[in-house]
């Protein structure tokens, strides 16, 4: 879909028991397109005009024969189907149908928090907490408590106590909040059914841990589900999404000196926790959605819906959106994105580049930041196709784009005029394509001309993510955006998991200060990162080509593959990012940061999205605004 084509959105019905609730469909926004006069991106090949059937057209043509799957059409509707609330008091969550108390042992046993819990429950919380030794992974125990109700009846309360590891039990590279343990244990709890509530009382040693724990809670209660309901046999129940009950979260600061409600986390800390949790759930849902539903058109629509949501809020500086589809990408010289998305485009799933921009109060006088996300909606490996064991799960290859979009929405929500980040502009660039197999697929030995002007010989069609990112960072660092800081986020290499594992993203940067700030942001947010070598003199040579400026895959797969992949992306930055000093108006040198989230973007075992990267980027933007990264 391109130009002024509108997004078709169907009205949604969500089934809860035998009740059907109609959810209003959001207003469709047209896709804007901007083209520039540049050479055709693929070397030695002219662009071919293709007629195609859009997703909307296909659905209209088949509606009469195939029942529509009545899934929510917007993030707000998905969130409404499985509500997560931050802000209730401890007393409020203690009155829910089930209760989980979470925190380090000393905080859980804090009498100021326990004073808000019914006395009979309080005794069980103490007993369970005292009996547990959390070690370095935390611990959980569950019991049932007989509660006397105000009408003289009795009921059973399912009580769970989760004790997080003390900071002293965790290594220096881990997050002192122990948020990894919170996510692990809370994920074992059942999401409440419609009409029921689950209360989560979080006892924190400090309000600064609120975001990390909130992100962990968001991971434990994701929104996407295609599981059928009890009404699946009815016409409207077939394919419907069940409405879950509400998870209500109270955050209590055990370090507060005053007693009672004075310990409740409020203000900026609470707002940050809620906004980041929303961003994490958005990113996780995008990753979890099947590729037939989350195709390039759908991912573009997610970005435009986020833009519309932000613009609908009062006090938010305008957010602009520019969308380039295949014809505009060809005209603009985005050869990497066009090449990767060529086969899917023939079937109507055109590649795209989406640019969201939130102008800060100081504009060009302050540092601007561009978040660039890899959005491969499905990766078959291309003509060098993945095997039967390697292709399942490749719907998650858009995790970088999902994380940057979730972080952008959270950052703008928390910083309506950009003051928190120093008043500079914030950009989000999504590089979207499906790496499909077909007659139009790019081939080994093809040469692509990327946005940077560099030519790339293809020696691995399954190393496609770096090609779309190359165009993204060239766009972000070039004259159109001219960002001071460029951060690219991607599920880029399986080698990342070999280098830094499933809990740590691997990062590469040309700035030691930026690298250090990212590591610190990871420990604060719970989205852990670890530096990998930045050495262009060693790694650029891996991409040598006899016929082009470079190849897209390394010669030596044992030579720091993840660093090499990052270096490939860096080679497409504007020239003033190559270690030059000065920057705009005497500011620090322009900087680049590469974040490979291949491992932590999904949960091992379930394969579900984690929303990793949202909390990290929001904290990194906060640190950048306060100049804590210099």
Predicted regions and their residues:
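Short amphipathic alpha-helical segment within the helicase RecA-like ATPase core
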Residues: 60-368, 372-375
């Amino acid at each position: 879909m391109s130009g002024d084509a509108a997004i078709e959105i169907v009205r949604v019905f969500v089934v809860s028991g035998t009740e059907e609730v109609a959810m209003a469909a959001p207003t469709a926004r047209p896709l804007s397109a901007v083209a520039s006069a540049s050479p055709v991106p693929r070397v030695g090949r002219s662009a071919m005009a293709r007629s195609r059937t859009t997703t909307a057209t296909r659905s209209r043509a088949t509606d009469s024969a195939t029942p529509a799957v009545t899934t929510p059409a917007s993030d707000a509707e998905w969130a409404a189907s499985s509500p997560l609330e931050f802000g209730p008091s401890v007393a409020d969550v203690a009155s829910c149908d089930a209760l989980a108390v979470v925190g380090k042992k000393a905080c859980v046993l804090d009498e100021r928090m326990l004073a808000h819990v019914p006395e009979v429950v309080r005794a069980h919380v103490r007993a369970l907490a005292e009996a547990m030794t959390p070690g370095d992974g935390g611990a959980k125990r569950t019991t049932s408590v007989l509660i006397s109700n105000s009408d003289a009846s009795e009921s059973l309360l399912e009580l769970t106590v989760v004790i997080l590891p003390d900071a002293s039990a965790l290594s220096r590279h881990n997050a002192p909040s122990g948020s990894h343990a919170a996510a692990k244990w809370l994920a074992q709890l059942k999401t409440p059914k419609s009409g029921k509530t689950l209360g989560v009382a979080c006892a924190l040693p400090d309000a600064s841990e609120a975001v990390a724990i909130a992100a962990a809670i968001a991971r434990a209660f994701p929104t996407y589900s295609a599981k059928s309901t009890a009404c699946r046999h009815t016409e409207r129940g077939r394919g419907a999404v069940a409405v879950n009950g509400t998870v209500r979260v109270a955050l209590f600061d055990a370090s507060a000196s005053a007693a009672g409600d004075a310990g409740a986390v409020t203000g900026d800390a609470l707002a940050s926790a809620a906004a980041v949790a929303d961003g994490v759930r958005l990113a996780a849902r995008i990753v979890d959605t099947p590729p037939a539903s989350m195709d390039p058109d759908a991912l573009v629509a997610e970005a435009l819906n986020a833009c519309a949501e932000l613009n609908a809020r009062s006090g938010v500086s305008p957010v602009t959106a520019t969308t380039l589809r295949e014809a505009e990408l060809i005209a603009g010289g985005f050869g990497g994105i066009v090449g990767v998305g060529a086969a899917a485009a023939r079937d109507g799933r055109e590649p795209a580049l989406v640019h969201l921009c939130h102008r800060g109060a100081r504009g060009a006088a302050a540092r601007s930041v561009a978040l660039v996300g890899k959005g491969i909606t499905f990766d078959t490996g291309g003509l060098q196709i993945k095997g039967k064991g390697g292709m399942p799960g490749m719907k998650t290859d858009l995790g970088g784009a999902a994380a940057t979009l979730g972080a952008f929405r959270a950052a703008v929500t928390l910083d309506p005029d950009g003051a928190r980040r120093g008043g500079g502009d914030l950009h989000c660039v999504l590089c979207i394509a499906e790496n499909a197999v077909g007659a139009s697929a790019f081939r080994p030995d093809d040469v692509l001309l990327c946005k940077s002007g560099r030519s790339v010989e293809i020696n691995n069609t399954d190393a496609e993510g770096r090609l779309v990112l190359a165009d993204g960072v060239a766009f972000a660092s070039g004259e159109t955006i001219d960002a001071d800081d460029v951060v690219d986020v991607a599920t880029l290499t399986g080698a990342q998991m070999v280098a830094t594992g499933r809990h740590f993203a691997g990062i590469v940067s040309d700035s030691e200060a930026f690298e250090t700030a990212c590591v610190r942001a990871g420990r604060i947010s719970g989205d852990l990162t670890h530096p990998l070598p930045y050495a262009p003199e060693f790694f650029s040579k891996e991409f040598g080509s006899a016929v082009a400026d470079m190849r897209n895959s390394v010669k030596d797969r044992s030579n720091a593959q993840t660093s090499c992949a990052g270096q490939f992306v860096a080679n497409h930055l504007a020239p003033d990012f190559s270690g030059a000093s000065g920057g705009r108006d005497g500011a620090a040198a322009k900087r680049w940061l590469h974040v490979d989230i291949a491992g932590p973007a999904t949960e091992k075992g379930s394969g579900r999205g984690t929303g990793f990267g949202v909390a990290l980027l929001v904290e990194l933007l906060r640190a950048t605004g306060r100049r804590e990264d210099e």
